[in-house]
């Protein structure tokens, strides 16, 4: 079967860039002095027996971060960024991730084999330590996984003379593997980033600096007698099987090639079930990147892989691959500033890249990538290993690496309430995703704009919207809670205290009600909105003008409006999950405190500068506005936004204390009497709600609440209650909610970890 010139036959509009990607990143845990740690793998990361994203490689201190399959290089890096964020915030606070492929200074006896549950995996690692030594096992890197797109493969198949798709794909991936190994020196030259080994790593003297220790024969390679042919897939499979039978290898995965066929559990299955994708294993960690690999590297490698498919297969595969290995070794061992040797036929690569880009009409971005490759071929200063040279001090990169590790650690803890790469999602969803990754629950974002997730563990699938809307709530429950009139009736029927009042569907009806409430304290609010929108509170009797303004504000949010009695006391939010109160929050209305110098408008701006404040529920606290509601509130107190407040004078900008309208959050879970927590839970249960926010007005929290004498009034129940405000509070310890959501959805994971 010949695949030469097949790519050239495709139409220019063919989906040449279509592919699936995955990244595996290895990294060592070290302390803040750059010394290897001896702590066990973090227990908060769940069981390594099933964790899909965070594992340990050879050593107990060597983390392996594994992305899900992504449809683009950008998404793969986004996944890796999030998993790196989770890993960085799951290890001990005095630990960081080492950003280099070569480990810090170490001794063989320091290296502890990963303490895995699987007996074979432990035995396998002990075997490797005995055979290859433990120091080599501490070398880390990046594995770049790629599957050609389904439509691209189909287009190539249609251009071929083949009738068997599995055989065709096997031949396609075999050709890619052959040319990748033939030209692997390109990867070593461009992206090698392990120019030195720290003192004591090798027993013998080795020349340094070099382009890549890891990608030379000084790195993690098989014994010289292990020679596997890539002439055919059958040859490949049979050779490895023979080495295992002879005892030269203990398992198929002990064959350490720069490229590995993937998609089946055993190699022989490739012959009849097919290769699914390729794993390219020869990438050094890029220490200039927090996640170890840059976007341009990902995309350049993608182009190079396609160029390898564009190029013809070698006529003599074994000879070409042997020459490729020798050239790679020469380039890996050479000084980072040494030009490429004459036998490195860069023109073959450049021509293939140019023709590929031209044939498929790829745009400026990919054309620039090709220009960068050409420039690096001409000037070694532009290669990654050369860029590391200025940071070598006394034959060591330890100081540079530690500074980078600490900087990346600090970045992970910046805006620690968010999930890196997913900051545009609603904050509670980000927190749930963080915990899902940490626990080892598979995830897929079905609709990012709609905050819709698919979570699964083994065969158990759950769908989650907005962080806590799940199958545990039936369809009618959120509808009932969205309707404040229905909520009041259900609670009243269950003998729970609710405020009295009436409902209106027009401004005229509401105004006609004024004579009945003109001397009363009242609340005007939309019937069916959440987050405190459109609510006005009058603790003193309202003038007709202010009452009309409040009605207009409420009608701007809904077609029906409630006018209720004002209940004096302090408002608390109770978070109820599955019949149990998990958190209690005191919310203080949006406010400013004067300093005798600045206007109210300026004080609001100062308070909004707090990094915890943001918009659209993507930060723990919300930006304080100075809109109609706030200015009405100021007017009732005799102020305008441009007035200067006396020092120490506190002015509320809202009467409602929702965090979503600029309020402050104070966690009082530990001090709130359990009687109120139980009462709030009973209210949620009466609604049939699984996840629910219960808002209670409590005049005196020292009084014990009972069903007969509740000493409180329920002013609202909220479906899809915010969770972040209970966790990241302005004051108090905070309560983790999203972890409990996941524990309820996947109790088998909790059981498996205890």
From Swiss-Prot:
GO molecular function, one term: glutamate-cysteine ligase activity
Region Glutamate--cysteine ligase: start-end pairs: 1-332
Binding site for Mn(2+) 2: 716, 718
Signal peptide: none
Note on cofactor: Binds 2 magnesium or manganese ions per subunit.
Residues binding Mg(2+) 1, per UniProt: 695, 716
Residues that bind ATP: 515-573
Cellular component GO terms held in the UniProt record: cytosol
Taxonomic superkingdom: Bacteria
InterPro entries the UniProt entry points to: ATP-grasp, Gln_synth/guanido_kin_cat_dom, Glu_cys_ligase, Glut_biosynth, Glut_cys_ligase, GshAB_ATP-grasp
Cofactor: Mg(2+); Mn(2+)
Residues at which Mg(2+) 2 binds: 716, 718
Pathways involved: Sulfur metabolism; glutathione biosynthesis; glutathione from L-cysteine and L-glutamate: step 1/2; Sulfur metabolism; glutathione biosynthesis; glutathione from L-cysteine and L-glutamate: step 2/2
Pfam families hit by this protein: ATP-grasp_6, Glu_cys_ligase
Keyword annotations of the record: ATP-binding, Glutathione biosynthesis, Ligase, Magnesium, Manganese, Metal-binding, Multifunctional enzyme, Nucleotide-binding
ATP-grasp domain boundaries: 488-746
Catalytically driven reaction(s): L-cysteine + L-glutamate + ATP = gamma-L-glutamyl-L-cysteine + ADP + phosphate + H(+); gamma-L-glutamyl-L-cysteine + glycine + ATP = glutathione + ADP + phosphate + H(+)
Function: Synthesizes glutathione from L-glutamate and L-cysteine via gamma-L-glutamyl-L-cysteine.
Protein family according to the UniProt entry: In the N-terminal section; belongs to the glutamate--cysteine ligase type 1 family. Type 2 subfamily.
PANTHER family: GLUTAMATE--CYSTEINE LIGASE
Subunit details: Monomer.
Protein name, UniProt field: Glutathione biosynthesis bifunctional protein GshAB
Protein's organism: Streptococcus thermophilus (strain ATCC BAA-250 / LMG 18311)
Gene transcribed to yield this protein: gshAB
């Amino acid at each position: 079967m010949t695949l030469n010139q097949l790519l050239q036959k495709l139409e220019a509009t063919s989906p040449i860039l279509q592919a699936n990607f995955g990244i595996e990143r290895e990294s060592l845990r070290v302390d803040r002095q750059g010394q290897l740690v001896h702590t066990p793998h973090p227990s908060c990361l769940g069981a390594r027996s099933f964790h899909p994203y965070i594992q340990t490689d050879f050593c107990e201190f060597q983390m392996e971060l594994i992305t899900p399959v992504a449809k683009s290089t950008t998404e793969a890096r986004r996944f890796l960024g999030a998993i790196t964020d989770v890993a960085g915030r799951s290890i001990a606070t005095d630990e960081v991730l080492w950003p280099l492929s070569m480990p810090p200074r170490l001794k063989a006896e320091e290296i502890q084999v990963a303490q895995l549950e699987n007996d074979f995996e432990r035995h396998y690692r002990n075997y490797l330590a005995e055979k290859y030594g433990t120091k080599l096992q501490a070398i880390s890197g990046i594995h770049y996984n790629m599957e050609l797109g389904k439509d691209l493969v189909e287009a190539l198949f249609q251009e071929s003379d083949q009738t068997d798709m599995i055989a065709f794909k096997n031949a396609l991936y075999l050709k890619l593997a052959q040319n990748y190994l033939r030209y692997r020196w390109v990867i070593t030259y461009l992206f090698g980033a392990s120019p030195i080994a720290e003192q004591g790593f090798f027993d013998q003297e080795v020349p340094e600096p070099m382009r890549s220790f890891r990608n030379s024969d000084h790195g993690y390679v098989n014994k010289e007698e292990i020679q596997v042919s890539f002439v055919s897939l059958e040859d490949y499979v049979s050779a490895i099987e023979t080495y295992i039978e002879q005892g030269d290898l203990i398992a198929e995965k002990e064959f350490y090639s720069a490229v590995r066929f993937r998609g089946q559990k055993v190699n022989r299955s490739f012959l009849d079930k097919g290769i699914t994708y390729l794993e390219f294993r020869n990438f050094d960690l890029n220490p200039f990147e927090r996640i170890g690999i840059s976007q341009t590297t990902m995309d350049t490698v993608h182009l190079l892989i396609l160029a390898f498919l564009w190029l013809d297969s070698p006529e003599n595969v074994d000879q070409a691959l042997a020459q490729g290995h020798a050239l790679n070794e020469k380039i890996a061992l050479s000084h980072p500033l040494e030009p490429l040797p004459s036998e490195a036929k860069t023109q073959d690569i450049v021509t293939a890249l140019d023709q590929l880009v031209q044939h498929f009409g790829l745009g400026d971005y990919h054309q620039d990538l090709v220009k960068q490759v050409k420039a690096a071929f001409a000037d070694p200063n532009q290669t990654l290993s050369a860029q590391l040279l200025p940071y070598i001090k006394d034959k060591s990169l330890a100081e540079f690496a530690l500074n980078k590790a600490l900087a990346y650690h600090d970045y992970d803890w910046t805006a620690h309430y968010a999930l890196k790469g997913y900051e545009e999602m609603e904050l509670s969803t980000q927190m749930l995703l963080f915990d899902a990754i940490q626990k080892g629950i598979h995830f897929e974002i079905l609709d990012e704009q709609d905050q819709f997730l698919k979570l699964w563990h083994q065969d158990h699938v759950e769908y989650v919207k907005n962080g806590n809307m799940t199958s545990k709530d039936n369809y009618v429950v959120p509808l009932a809670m969205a309707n404040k009139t229905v909520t009041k009736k259900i609670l009243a029927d269950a003998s729970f205290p609710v405020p009295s009042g009436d409902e209106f569907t027009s401004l005229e009806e509401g105004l006609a009600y004024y004579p009945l409430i003109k001397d009363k304290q009242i609340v005007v609010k939309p019937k069916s909105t959440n987050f405190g929108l459109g609510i006005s509170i009058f603790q003193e009797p309202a003038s007709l003008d202010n009452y009309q303004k409040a009605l207009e504000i409420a009608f701007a949010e809904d077609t029906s409006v409630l006018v209720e009695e004002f209940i004096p006391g302090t408002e608390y939010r109770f978070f109820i999950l599955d019949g149990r109160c998990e958190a209690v929050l005191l919310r203080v209305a949006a406010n400013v405190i004067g300093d005798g110098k600045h206007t109210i408008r300026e004080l609001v701006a100062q308070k909004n500068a707090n990094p915890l404040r943001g918009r659209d529920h993507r930060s723990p606290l919300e930006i304080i506005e100075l809109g109609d509601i706030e200015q009405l509130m100021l007017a009732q107190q005799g102020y305008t936004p441009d007035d200067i407040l006396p020092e120490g004078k506190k002015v509320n900008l809202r009467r409602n204390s929702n965090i979503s309208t600029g309020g402050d959050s104070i966690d009082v879970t530990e001090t709130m009497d359990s009687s109120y927590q139980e009462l709030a839970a009973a209210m949620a249960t009466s609604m049939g709600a699984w996840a629910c926010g219960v808002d209670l007005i409590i005049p005196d929290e020292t009084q014990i609440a009972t069903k007969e004498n509740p000493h409180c009034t329920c002013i609202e129940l909220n479906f899809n209650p915010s969770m972040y405000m209970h966790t990241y509070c302005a004051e108090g310890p905070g309560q983790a909610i999203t972890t409990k959501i996941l524990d309820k959805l996947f109790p088998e994971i909790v059981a498996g970890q205890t």
